[in-house]
């Protein structure tokens, strides 16, 4: 890939935790990859850019408000998006939900024709918004998000139900109302009903497919 500006198209998918962002991103990636090939499309989760907390104790890490913009290393994410757009590869961080910090390993990611970026706080940062070619907000009722989050965090991330509920009441819901929901105004497309909205996914596929022509 050359250094031609904006050759890498960035598509942002935001919304509440457990709203269906990852499902939409993975569905779009899988179905478009089958059409154009793995070398032309990739996915970057915002969760990979939670700040490194290896200098903190486990007790301190647990107290971090992971739903506040300050928990994210958006400076690094912004830098990586600029690198990809200028034709340079990046080392994508990996985050451990059980250790509450970054892993030592990274994933080498070459520039792609299209990068799908998904995460809860993407649209809160003007720099990230300006790097996106277009953005999507997945608008799912909070009670549904809570049920999905409890199932996911208990089954996949080793959390207890009590800790998930306590975190939801203390930070997840308040931060959604303060930061995430207001960022919906910056989205180009709002998708209701989450990742199982097949009509919305087909419309998004058609839109993204234009970048491969």
Curated annotation (Swiss-Prot):
Keywords in alphabetical order: ATP-binding, Cytoplasm, Kinase, Nucleotide-binding, Transferase
GO CC field: cytoplasm
Binding-site residues for ATP, renumbered to this chain: 15-22
Superkingdom in the source lineage: Bacteria
Enzyme Commission numbers on file: 2.7.1.48
This protein's pathway: Pyrimidine metabolism; CTP biosynthesis via salvage pathway; CTP from cytidine: step 1/3; Pyrimidine metabolism; UMP biosynthesis via salvage pathway; UMP from uridine: step 1/1
Molecular function in Gene Ontology: ATP binding; cytidine kinase activity; uridine kinase activity
The reaction(s) this protein catalyses: uridine + ATP = UMP + ADP + H(+); cytidine + ATP = CMP + ADP + H(+)
GO biological process: CTP salvage; UMP salvage
Protein name as catalogued: Uridine kinase
